[in-house]
């Protein structure tokens, strides 16, 4: 049943450096020929994207399906290629986003924090420091309501506290300085921890998992709405005040997620769901893998890496999705799992597999995949595929956008 959601992987698997010699060298640098073919495909897809965006929703400000996501793509292209016209495009699109903020959601991907954070970085690169500071001030004005959890704010990435947390981390990483004071970040993490403890105790599972989170009364597991996405951030160095709490609260909660693994190596969308169906970044191995790799980095337990490697096998076998080529539930998003494994292991097999998924993406539209609701957006559509292809040009620096830190 699960196989029906993916197309059969037509690529031969990695057998040694010989099969990858046209793709990259022993240091993981792409060959000039392969890099040139990726760059030309990016240019080709950008022309299609720009034309398609003429019919996009003018009021969608978000990173997920709207203008902020397109702005982030161009900001990324500016980082990779250094072309100032990309930065100007980022400014054009982020200004559209700022004109139509939700006034409701507070996250990077689906709310107002993303447009404000992206705008602050774009303005900063353009030396427009007053405008940049204004966006940062507006971003920080949201912080008290996020800590307090106003409006029954959830904790997950797309609509909750973690999504606001990422916005603050994004700013500090892009500015390469502590532009957002660290106590603001730790206060968010404290609130996330407290919320997780309350639900765990309410559900009487604190002995199994000291933390628990839900979204619309469901205990989601994946990166977008669930436990693995939240724990990935709570294990980042220094975000949680007091390393003892990472060991006493986060580690056993991570272990609880590990116990939910299917025999295949995949993970359910929700606690208690026995169907091994989804191999997406949002639900399944391609999102859980980041939690596992971070747990291995922090706790040094080999089993976390073994589980992450098993996620890689699931992605290789079932990751070329009929849903298309996007980030959230598509081939590009799934390919980032290989890049994460490559960065932690330096095993060229994982870079090779990412290159094969890139080849699939470079044949965009030729596999009979479904057309997304927002076919040119960052998380559902073509913009996300372009973002991935640009990231593959420098694999050691690649990060899943709006998520990986």
From Swiss-Prot:
Amino acids binding Zn(2+): 282, 328-329
The EC number(s) this enzyme carries: 2.5.1.18
Superkingdom as given in the UniProt entry: Eukaryota
Topological relation to the membrane, as annotated: Peripheral membrane protein
Keyword Hydrolase attached: no
CC per GO annotation: cytoplasm; plasma membrane
Subcellular location: Cytoplasm; Cell membrane
Disulfide bonds: none
Reactions catalysed according to its record: RX + glutathione = an S-substituted glutathione + a halide anion + H(+); 1-chloro-2,4-dinitrobenzene + glutathione = 2,4-dinitrophenyl-S-glutathione + chloride + H(+)
One Gene Ontology biological process: carbohydrate metabolic process
Keywords, ordered alphabetically: Cell membrane, Cytoplasm, Membrane, Metal-binding, Transferase, Zinc
Residues reported in the UniProt entry to bind glutathione: 323, 370-373
Pfam families: LANC_like (PF05147)
InterPro entries: 6hp_glycosidase-like_sf, LANC-like, LanC-like_prot_euk
Molecular function terms, GO-annotated: glutathione binding; glutathione transferase activity; zinc ion binding
Major site of localization recorded for this protein: cytoplasm
Membership in a protein family: Belongs to the LanC-like protein family.
Function, as annotated: Functions as a glutathione transferase. Catalyzes conjugation of the glutathione (GSH) to artificial substrates 1-chloro-2,4-dinitrobenzene (CDNB) and p-nitrophenyl acetate. Binds glutathione.
Protein name: Glutathione S-transferase LANCL1
Lineage: Eukaryota, Metazoa, Chordata, Craniata, Vertebrata
Encoding gene (name): lancl1
């Amino acid at each position: 049943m699960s196989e029906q959601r993916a197309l059969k992987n037509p690529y031969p698997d990695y057998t040694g450096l010989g099969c990858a010699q046209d793709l990259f060298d022993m240091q993981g640098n792409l060959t000039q020929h392969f890099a040139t073919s990726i760059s030309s495909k990016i240019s080709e897809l950008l022309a299609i994207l720009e034309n398609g965006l003429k019919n996009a929703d003018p009021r969608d400000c978000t990173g997920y399906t709207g203008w902020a996501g397109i702005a982030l793509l161009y900001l990324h292209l500016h980082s990779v290629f250094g072309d100032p016209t990309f930065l100007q495009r980022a400014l054009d699109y982020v200004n559209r986003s700022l004109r139509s903020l939700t006034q409701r959601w507070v996250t990077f991907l689906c709310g107002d924090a993303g447009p404000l954070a992206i705008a602050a970085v774009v303005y900063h690169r353009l030396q427009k420091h007053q405008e940049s500071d204004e966006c940062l001030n507006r971003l920080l004005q949201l912080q008290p309501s996020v800590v307090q959890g106003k409006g029954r704010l959830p904790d997950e990435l797309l609509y909750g506290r973690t999504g606001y947390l990422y916005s603050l981390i994004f700013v500090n990483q892009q500015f390469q300085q502590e532009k957002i004071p660290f106590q603001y970040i730790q206060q968010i993490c404290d609130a996330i921890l407290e919320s997780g403890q309350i639900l765990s105790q309410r559900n009487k599972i604190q002995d199994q998992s000291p933390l628990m989170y839900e979204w619309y009364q469901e205990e989601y597991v994946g990166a977008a709405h669930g436990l693995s996405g939240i724990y990935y951030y709570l294990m980042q160095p220094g975000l949680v005040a007091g390393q003892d709490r990472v060991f006493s609260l986060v580690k056993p909660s991570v272990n609880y997620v590990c116990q939910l693994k299917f025999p295949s190596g995949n993970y359910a969308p929700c606690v208690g769901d026995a169907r091994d169906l989804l191999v997406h970044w949002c639900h399944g191995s391609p999102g859980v893998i980041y939690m596992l790799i971070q747990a291995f980095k922090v706790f040094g337990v080999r089993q976390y890496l073994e589980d992450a490697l098993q996620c890689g096998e699931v992605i290789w076998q079932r990751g070329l999705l009929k849903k298309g080529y996007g980030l959230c539930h598509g081939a590009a998003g799934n390919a980032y799992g290989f890049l994460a494994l490559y960065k932690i292991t330096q095993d060229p097999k994982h870079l090779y597999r990412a290159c094969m998924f890139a080849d699939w993406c470079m044949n965009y539209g030729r596999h009979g995949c479904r057309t997304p609701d927002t076919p040119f957006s960052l998380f559902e559509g073509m913009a996300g595929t372009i973002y991935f292809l640009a990231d593959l040009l420098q694999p050691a620096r690649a990060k899943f956008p709006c998520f990986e830190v």
